Amino acid sequence: MLMIFLGITITLFFTDVILVLAGCRKNIYSLTKYAKPFLCPLILAGYILALTPLLPDSRNIMLMLSISLACSTAGSILADYIKKRICILAGAAAFTAAGACFLVLLHPSFYLCPIPVWLYALTAAGLAAADIFTILHFFRKEDIILSVITAACFTVLYAFLGAAVVTAAGSFRLYSLLLLAGAVLLLPQSFWTAERFTRSDKKNKQFETTLLFALSELLVCAGFCCMILL
């Protein structure tokens, strides 16, 4: 079981690195386009595949996973076809989060989560806040409502899905491995954002947004590490 989990995690890590490097060669829009629509379902798939033998009603969980992956892929393709950058982010987030909601409903124990899981939710909220400020910073005022919806979807995806999965793990060892894997998966994007921040001009419009984005992602990583220590 541990070897299967490590194999999935390592695969996701290198996939993350490749996608982030591809985004570095373009710009922030390219990173959003190529990385996030694929990373959400990939991380979701890795977690569920690793935990399926430990969870009740595994058939239902795999069914919900399939729905989530299908919806996320359809949303990404549709958004790319529309050629509107905001839709690429919102579509992938909304459809993936919709599948995540089904998974959360299968685990009502989320509402009895320990303090570390709620700490996860708080750090995830910081990342969602960075998403909404990034969108508001780069797009027109008429996209504000869609921006709020997108940030809400990311909050559901990162906080509720992650909390439900780690709660269902049951084993402290596996729980710690999941949190560590999540921190590792976030590091490449955090490093890329921090590196972009150092190159930004203080007079540049992107400066404040990039700083907030980098700090929020590093906060998520720090949250993972704190939960492991707890």
Language-model features: locations:
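Polytopic alpha-helical membrane-helix bundles and their juxtamembrane interface segments
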Residues: 1-230
